[in-house]
A protein has these predicted regions:
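Bacterial N-terminal signal peptides
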Residues: 10-20
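C-terminal beta-strand-rich structural cap/linker in extracellular carbohydrate-active enzymes
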Residues: 423-471, 551
Length: 572
């Protein structure tokens, strides 16, 4: 019987590969693709009568909402093992929902199960209180957490046995909700296969007796490593056999079969989500920017690659774990450092993509194993992300925006399936990520450079350059009243002798006070002005009286939570 199943899986996998090839080229990116997990809050459950301690977690999530909002996250999951162990109070549910929505994001709410500690009536009561009594109209709901780990369930029958009654009870209260499951701790193929066998004994994708679909989104978690990974493993993992790329291709074949068999289409079509994800669930004790864990630069690039593969395969949303947690380097796996509030490379990679990837996914191919590339495209722009994960190699690169072979001797050749007959040449530094934005004709209009040695070590975000026409960097006109949002339009002259002007893309009509800083290439602060007025959007800087040497410097401008950076070259 086991051999028969293996043959069936092999045939299905071959079929889904064909399905994927036909699907990739025009794969829309979900409008709520970029997600996070609401972890770690201060308290979950009744602290005075905690069922399974601890209920008091001492988390500082309430201080991080501005960071989460500014990262570009759009969908936030309130769930995980803590929510499953100790049912949140009504106040905690509502406070979390209101905090998420106050920052322009949409909540995903988990009801607890904890191996029958909680029942379907309690789940229905939670839906009733939140959606009916409180009028919060939460769309996405999750049942339980990691049944194959937390409950040690190893059979689909065990999971279907609680998913179905919970889903029916919840949808009887509010038929408009969408339910997510089974929330496997990893891509547990055997369990997921049985749960997605149309009309099989454990199928959770069909309808109950009241005509309600049980599950609307098939979900799983992924933490590929445990902290012992090598750099080579990190670079090759996601597209290796049996890893994320293969798993999503296989899952798409299951979902397609369920949609066909159950007549699910349009808004009722079954979808997929990854509701917890990170490079590892714990770091090596020595992990830092130069390591290979959640605090490392390549860890941020790993996040970007996970998002690219997920977009390519039509994942509706991916929620990374987590915002901020951990009191030591092993448990510090959030995208904001819980101790220092420093934004990690994972934060900036997430933000780069969340702010710039729109429309359809665009596939990319490269001729270097240590370089990955992919992008997005809408009617106005094509975004191309290049991840150079090589430790030492700087590459002369040619990017072509279609699949025509690239001539010449460039060390790095990248073809993007964007159907634009245009090429662009650039030097891609080692251990760096570069995002290029082209207009509909294939002309470069924006560039974001984020590298280990120039940005991450200085704890600054990507260096931004905006292009206009053929004469270099030009300012872009924008409304005067845009709150704290701004861009650095240009720095001139550049190169310079230490005297230069920073020009923003808008006039400072509200007389806001900006912070302007200049760092050397080693990340040391060499100049700071805390109340830069930017009269008419311009600020003159004179470093000729400072003891600075010729070289490359980073200019950073801050206003509230908005931070923009760019490079200058000083020649004395």
């Amino acid at each position: 019987m086991k051999n028969t199943k293996k043959v069936i899986y092999a045939v299905l996998f071959s079929m889904c590969l064909l399905f994927a090839v036909n699907k990739v080229n025009a794969q829309p990116i979900s409008p709520h693709f970029f997600g996070q997990n609401a972890w770690m809050p201060d308290t979950i459950g009744n602290a005075s009568a905690c069922t399974e301690p601890p209920c008091i977690l001492y988390g500082k999530l309430h201080h991080e909402w501005a960071n989460v909002k500014n990262s570009g996250a759009s969908i936030i999951r309130f769930g995980g093992i803590a929510v499953d162990k100790n049912i949140p109070t009504n106040y905690q549910y509502i406070r979390m929902i209101d905090s998420i929505r106050a920052n322009g994001m949409e909540p995903v709410i988990q009801v607890p199960f904890r191996n029958y500690r909680y029942n379907e009536q309690q789940a229905a009561d939670i839906v009733k209180f939140i959606n009916i009594t409180s009028g919060k109209n939460i769309k996405y709901w999750i049942i339980g957490n990691e049944p194959d780990l937390g409950y040690s369930y190893n059979q689909a029958s065990q999971i279907a046995a609680y998913i179905k009654p919970f889903a029916s009870a919840m949808k009887n209260v509010d038929p408009s909700i969408l339910i997510i499951g089974p929330e496997c701790a990893w891509f547990n193929q055997g369990i997921i296969t049985d749960l997605t066998t149309p009309n099989g004994p454990y199928d959770i994708t069909g309808k109950d007796g009241n005509g309600h679909y049980y599950i609307d989104v098939i979900s799983f978690h992924t933490y590929p490593f445990n902290g012992s990974q090598t750099r080579a493993q990190v670079i090759s993992k996601l597209t290796s056999s049996g890893s994320l790329q293969d798993n999503l291709v296989y899952l798409n074949s299951r979902v397609s079969s369920c949609n066909t068999s159950h007549g699910r289409n349009g808004s009722s079509a079954l979808k997929t989500a990854i509701t917890e994800a990170n490079i590892d669930w714990q770091n090596n004790a020595a992990d830092n920017l130069y390591g290979v864990g959640a605090s490392s630069f390549i860890g941020g690039q790993f996040w970007a690659e996970m998002m690219g593969i997920s977009m390519k395969n039509g994942v509706d949303f991916i929620n990374f774990w987590s915002v901020a947690e951990g009191s030591n380097s092993v448990s510090n796996i959030g995208y904001v450092d819980a101790s220092t509030n420093t934004k990690k490379p994972s934060y900036y990679h997430f933000q780069l993509m969340a702010e710039n990837f729109k429309g359809n996914y665009v596939n990319g191919t490269t001729n270097q194993l240590n370089v990955k590339s992919f992008g997005s495209q809408n009617s106005q722009e094509t975004a191309v992300l290049v991840l150079n994960e090589d430790l030492t190699s700087n590459y002369n690169c040619t990017i072509r925006l279609n699949n025509t072979a690239i001539a010449g001797n460039s060390q790095l050749k990248i073809n993007m399936n964007a159907n634009i007959a245009a090429e662009f040449n650039e030097v891609i530094q080692s251990q760096s990520t570069v995002l290029f934005i082209f207009n509909s004709s294939g002309a470069l209009i924006k560039k974001y450079e984020y590298s280990l040695n120039q940005n991450a070590v200085a704890n600054i975000g990507p260096t931004y350059t905006q292009y206009g026409g053929t004469t270099g960097i030009e300012p872009i006109k924008s409304p005067a009243h845009e709150g704290t949002y701004f861009e650095i339009a240009k720095v001139f002259p550049n190169p310079n002798t230490g005297k230069f002007t920073v020009q923003l893309n808008k006039e400072n009509t509200d007389e806001l006070k900006y912070v302007l800083e200049v760092f050397n290439i080693e990340g040391q602060l060499v100049y700071e002005k805390n109340d830069a007025p930017f009269v008419k959007g311009k600020q003159d800087i004179d470093l000729t009286f400072e003891s600075i040497a010729s070289g490359v410097y980073i200019v950073r401008v801050r206003l509230g939570e908005n931070i923009k950076t760019t490079k200058i070259v000083v020649v004395k």
